[in-house]
UniProtKB/Swiss-Prot annotation:
Domain of life: Bacteria
Organism: Clostridium tetani (strain Massachusetts / E88)
Gene this chain is encoded by: rplV
Family from the record: Belongs to the universal ribosomal protein uL22 family.
Keyword Ribonucleoprotein: yes
Name of the protein: Large ribosomal subunit protein uL22
Length: 111
């Protein structure tokens, strides 16, 4: 049995989120929380929230033992891009892409 949690439209690029997700993929939940608490990146805060939600889903909806859970899947897909323009010299304007991501975490119980 697996429990899933998704955070959509996170205002952070999927590439930056993916770097932190690589740290917790395959780890036990308690170890993943410890890693995220000491990771100095903004994405760690978002992933911590999603992981807490996934553990709560496993505990309440599926009645799984939280001490035996591990991060089975962790990935960030690209969400819609917000396009903004930055004025530059001589009447030019450069486009700035503000990327968003959908963060998904799946936790399973170890056999």
């Amino acid at each position: 049995m697996e429990a899933k949690a998704i955070a959509k439209y996170v205002r952070m690029s999927p590439r930056k989120v993916g770097v932190v997700l690589d740290l917790v993929r395959g780890k036990d939940v308690n170890e993943a929380f410890a890693i995220l608490n000491y990771t100095p990146r903004e994405a760690a805060v978002v992933i911590n929230k999603v992981l807490k939600s996934a553990v709560a889903n496993a505990e309440n909806n599926l009645e799984l033992d939280p001490s035996r859970l591990y991060v089975a899947e962790a990935y960030a897909c690209q969400g819609p891009t917000l396009k903004r323009y930055q004025p530059h010299a001589q009447g030019r304007a450069f486009r700035i892409n503000k990327r968003t991501s959908h963060v998904t975490l799946v936790v399973k119980e170890r056999e």
